[in-house]
A protein has these predicted regions:
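Bacterial Sec-dependent N-terminal signal peptides
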Residues: 1-18
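N-terminal targeting and processing segments
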Residues: 16-82, 90-93, 108, 124
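Residues that define the transmembrane beta-barrel architecture of outer-membrane proteins
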Residues: 45-47, 221, 233, 271-277, ...
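Membrane-embedded beta-strand positions of outer-membrane beta-barrel proteins
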Residues: 51, 99, 113-115, 131, ...
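Residues on the lipid-exposed face of transmembrane beta-strands in outer-membrane beta-barrel proteins
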Residues: 51-53, 227, 239-241, 256, ...
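Transmembrane beta-strands of outer-membrane beta-barrel pores
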Residues: 55, 69-71, 85-87, 101-103, ...
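Solvent-exposed loop/turn segments connecting transmembrane beta-strands
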Residues: 57-60, 73-74, 89, 105, ...
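Repeated loop/turn-to-beta-strand initiation elements of outer-membrane beta-barrel proteins
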Residues: 61, 91-92, 107-109, 124, ...
Length: 398
């Protein structure tokens, strides 16, 4: 009854032509629905208190609370709270909270909390948190947290948290943590942490950490840590299974395979007294190289089938003429398969060291011989299974 009385009195007051034109002074807007309210919507009116179910007003300088939604044609300074959505045609300075969406046509300065989507058509300064996505048309500065997605059309700085992806159209400064993908169309300064991949189209200064890969389209100044790391130029550290730079490296690569455009990928076929028949791929740079491969019959040919995978990393130096001297350290994982039923351990590992002498016959073929020492050990206990001198020899195909 009180609300009905206020609506009736407000409506009669608005219809009184002898009074000041409604909406040109700050007022109270109690609203049941669009057009059913104590304050009519015009192009100059201000509202300092709004309560209702669904409200439409020109400008809000104060508090607005609605069951369904609130629509403000120009700007909001204060607090806008709605069960479903808040829409501001201009800029908001203050706090917005809605069950589904907050939409600002221009700037957001303050805090925006939405169950699904938070949108700022131009810039966002402060906190924007949404269950599904946050979207900023131009710049963002502060904290963006989207359940799935953060999108900043141009530059962004601060902390970004997203369940799926964080996308910045230009430069990003700060910390971006995403479940799958971190993407910056320009340069990054700070940290990019992603479950799948980080991509910076320009330079990257700081740390890139990803479960699968990191990509820098310009110069890396810092550290890349992932399964695969790639940069046009690198000044720092690349740590991963596969590391690649295109133009220059002023730093260090630590990985199973370290490559650049001058890396030669070579096929190696060889035999030895550890695993008897072996095939491997050698990734050879000017001085350093890595070898990844596998071999069969770690045990004797008279035993059942056994096999191993190996990785070696070393340094090669030209000796004289067509001869090259190299040395490497290696790790070998050994599977005995059905031999475990005959008393052998099901799997072993071996640590090995080798000195290699290589003779290049032509531009496409070379012969090599290796000697070294190694020992195989149990995974399950601190004991040696076998140890001794290593002897190998074979051919390298360029």
């Amino acid at each position: 009854m009180t609300l009905l009385f206020l609506l009736t009195v407000g409506t009669l007051f608005a219809q009184n032509k002898e009074t000041t034109i409604a909406g040109k002074r700050p007022g109270i807007n109690l609203s049941l629905w669009k057009g059913i309210s104590t304050q009519r919507t015009d192009t100059v009116g201000n509202t300092f208190l709004n309560m209702g179910i669904l409200s439409t007003m020109n400008r809000l300088n104060g508090l607005g609370v609605n069951v369904i939604g609130s629509v403000v044609r120009t700007d909001v300074k204060g607090m806008q709270l709605s069960g479903l959505s808040n829409i501001t045609g201009g800029s908001l300075q203050g706090i917005q909270a809605a069950g589904i969406a907050n939409i600002n046509g221009n700037d957001l300065t303050g805090i925006s909390l939405a169950g699904l989507t938070g949108i700022a058509g131009n810039n966002a300064y402060g906190f924007m948190i949404a269950g599904l996505a946050t979207i900023t048309g131009n710049h963002s500065r502060g904290i963006l947290a989207g359940g799935l997605l953060n999108v900043s059309g141009e530059q962004a700085s601060g902390i970004h948290l997203a369940g799926l992806a964080d996308i910045t159209g230009e430069d990003f400064k700060g910390i971006a943590i995403t479940g799958l993908l971190g993407l910056a169309g320009g340069s990054t300064k700070g940290m990019q942490l992603a479950g799948l991949a980080n991509i910076a189209a320009g330079d990257a200064t700081g740390l890139q950490l990803a479960g699968l890969g990191n990509v820098v389209g310009g110069t890396l100044h810092g550290v890349q840590l992932g399964a695969a790391n790639m940069a046009i130029r690198a000044r720092g550290l690349q740590i991963g299974l596969f590391n690649y730079y295109k133009e220059s490296l002023d730093g260090f690569q630590l990985g199973l395979v370290n490559a650049n455009p001058e890396t030669r990928v070579q096929l190696m076929l060889f035999g030895g007294n550890a695993t008897k028949l072996n095939i491997g791929a050698r990734f050879k740079n000017r001085l350093f190289y890595t070898i990844v491969g596998g071999g069969t019959h770690y045990l004797d040919f008279s035993d059942k089938f056994s096999a191993a995978l190996f990785y070696r990393a070393g340094l090669a130096l030209p000796a004289w003429g067509r001869w090259t001297l190299s040395g490497d350290l290696g790790y070998q994982h050994i599977e005995t398969f059905k031999n475990k039923n005959l008393g052998f351990p099901p799997r072993l590992y071996a640590l090995q060291a080798r000195i290699n002498l290589e003779c290049r016959l032509t531009d496409r073929y070379a012969l090599f011989a290796s000697g070294g020492y190694g020992g195989s050990r149990y995974y399950t206990r601190n004991a040696t299974f076998d140890k001794g001198v290593l002897v190998e020899g074979g051919i390298i195909l360029f």
